[in-house]
From Swiss-Prot:
<keyword id="KW-0324">Glycolysis</keyword>
<keyword id="KW-0456">Lyase</keyword>
<feature type="binding site">
    <location>
        <position position="359"/>
    </location>
    <ligand>
        <name>(2R)-2-phosphoglycerate</name>
    </ligand>
</feature>
<feature type="active site" description="Proton donor">
    <location>
        <position position="209"/>
    </location>
</feature>
<feature type="binding site">
    <location>
        <position position="250"/>
    </location>
    <ligand>
        <name>Mg(2+)</name>
    </ligand>
</feature>
<keyword id="KW-0460">Magnesium</keyword>
<keyword id="KW-0964">Secreted</keyword>
<feature type="binding site">
    <location>
        <position position="167"/>
    </location>
    <ligand>
        <name>(2R)-2-phosphoglycerate</name>
    </ligand>
</feature>
<comment type="function">
    <text>Catalyzes the reversible conversion of 2-phosphoglycerate (2-PG) into phosphoenolpyruvate (PEP). It is essential for the degradation of carbohydrates via glycolysis.</text>
</comment>
<feature type="binding site">
    <location>
        <position position="307"/>
    </location>
    <ligand>
        <name>Mg(2+)</name>
    </ligand>
</feature>
<dbReference type="InterPro" id="IPR036849">
    <property type="entry name" value="Enolase-like_C_sf"/>
</dbReference>
<feature type="active site" description="Proton acceptor">
    <location>
        <position position="359"/>
    </location>
</feature>
<protein>
    <recommendedName>
        <fullName>Enolase</fullName>
        <ecNumber>4.2.1.11</ecNumber>
    </recommendedName>
</protein>
<dbReference type="GO" id="GO:0000015">
    <property type="term" value="C:phosphopyruvate hydratase complex"/>
</dbReference>
<dbReference type="GO" id="GO:0005576">
    <property type="term" value="C:extracellular region"/>
</dbReference>
<keyword id="KW-0479">Metal-binding</keyword>
<dbReference type="GO" id="GO:0009986">
    <property type="term" value="C:cell surface"/>
</dbReference>
């Protein structure tokens, strides 16, 4: 048994310049692990609580009372004494001890950010002690599947100060033989998209996740540019065959749902400000109308996946969406399911989705995250490993995606070091796998959830 000898947390900054927590764990046998916790902008109401310094003695340390020194103190003064002396390889025991220490359903006492930082650092320390890559430690010797990247090349919604209400417009390079070739293809599409935007007079500033954030007149205009960029790069906008590049959308519909209707507030405001409101243009939808709108997009564009197409409270919207389009398209739950096993069970029973987005900080421990992934996969769903909009140089999710053979990873565009770090880690993992056996990249076949 290799004991944990030291646990230390500190306050650092994430990719948006907001405070976040970093945790270091040391073991008796010389193991060391360090983890940085991400943070979301558009969050589900049922997510585990990210503890900030609002109304505490640390409140004025940072802008908006967004410090995390309370969470840091909870690690150093409450969690550390309880896990020092425990075996670093007993991940589930340590995670369960922290859950019990907190004692609340959403980890609001100690903070999900405090608990997750320790949970991930413990796993990394154990892997380091064994001189083993993290993905090998978590997944064993079997995983060789590299994930298809979902690259968020056009940002909107809460991730950008532009006119788009849909949060993410992504490309998925499917028709390629290796992860590196897929990334090379995405690189060409990304830079050709920039060229086309500039040629058409659009700005090429980027949003939180490294994608471009132009002020388009419609979501369709964004999709048109994606199709043109794919073609300009010499690839096939579609799902199948050599050089196929598909499109994926994260609508993040909870952000434009007012409790009764779905309202494209940003597009509507931009249209009115420019005095370009078209009498036939529609900005407000009920659930059925929004479903029909998605149907029009799916018929016109090579969209293979839509995430959070309806608000987290609109279960009937999700059920109807999955029933109508789930055989041929990936219907992903994020805000709906928040990486929570109990909520996922409900989604499975209701057949509301055929895929779940996995975000470590939505649930707050590595063990609970793995439980959600395994339940989804056992139920015939895909599990898409995801970053958050507030990220760092931490690359845990790259290893996790390979460890669990998720087949898909969503970690931003080909811009901003906090996003590129994950892609670089995946390139290293692919090289490592090829040195021992052969890394697998299967493109369209990762969608085993589609009929």
């Amino acid at each position: 048994m290799s004991k944990i000898t030291k646990v230390f947390a500190r306050e650092i900054l994430d990719s948006r310049g907001n405070p976040t927590i970093q945790v270091d764990v040391y073991t008796l046998a010389g193991g060391f692990g360090s983890a940085i916790v991400p943070s979301g902008a558009s969050t589900g109401s049922r997510e585990a609580l990210e503890l900030r310094d609002t109304n505490t003695k640390y409140a004025d340390n940072w802008y908006g009372q967004k410090g995390v020194m309370t969470a840091v103190d909870n690690v150093n003064n409450i969690i550390a004494p309880e896990i020092i002396g425990l075996c670093c390889k007993n991940q589930r025991l340590i995670d369960q001890k922290m859950i019990e220490l907190d004692g609340t359903p959403n980890k609001e006492k100690l903070g999900a950010n405090a608990i997750l930082g320790v949970s991930l650092a413990v796993a990394k320390a154990a892997a380091n002690e064994l001189r083993m890559p993290l993905f090998r430690y978590l997944g064993g010797t079997n995983p060789t599947l590299m994930p298809v990247p979902m690259l968020n090349v056009i940002n909107g919604g809460e991730h950008a100060s532009n006119t788009l209400d849909f949060q993410e417009f992504m490309i998925m390079p499917l028709g390629f033989r290796t992860f590196k070739e897929a990334l090379q293809a995405a690189n060409k599409v990304f830079h050709n998209l920039a060229k086309l935007l500039k040629k058409s007079g659009f700005e090429t500033q980027v949003g939180d996740e490294g994608g471009f954030a132009p002020n388009f007149n419609s979501h369709e205009q964004a999709l048109d540019f994606l199709v043109d960029a794919i073609k300009e790069s010499g690839f096939n906008p579609g799902f199948k065959g050599e050089n196929a590049v598909a499109i994926a959308i994260d609508a993040a519909a909870s952000e434009f749902y007012n409790g009764q209707k779905y309202v494209f507030k940003k597009l509507k405001s931009a249209s009115l400000n420019k005095n370009q409101a078209d009498l036939d243009e529609k900005f407000e939808f009920n659930s059925e109308e929004l479903l029909n709108y998605y149907g029009q997009l799916l018929a016109k564009y090579p969209i293979i996946s839509i995430e959070d197409g309806f608000a987290e409270s609109d279960w009937q919207g999700f059920i109807a969406f999955n029933q109508k389009y789930g055989n041929n398209h990936q219907i992903v739950g994020d805000d709906l399911t928040v990486t929570n096993v109990e909520i996922l069970k409900k989604a499975i029973n209701l057949k509301a989705i055929n895929s779940i987005l996995i975000k470590l900080n939505q649930i707050g421990t590595l063990s609970e995250t793995l439980d959600a992934i395994h339940l989804a996969q056992k139920s015939g769903m895909t599990a898409v490993i995801s970053h958050r909009s507030g990220e760092s140089e931490d690359t845990t999710i790259a290893d996790l995606a390979v460890a669990v053979s998720s087949g898909q990873i969503k970690t931003g565009s080909l811009s901003r070091t906090d996003r590129i770090a994950k892609y670089n880690r995946l390139l290293v993992i692919e090289e490592y796998l090829n040195s021992y056996a052969k890394a697998d990249y299967i493109g369209r076949e990762v969608f085993y959830n589609l009929k």
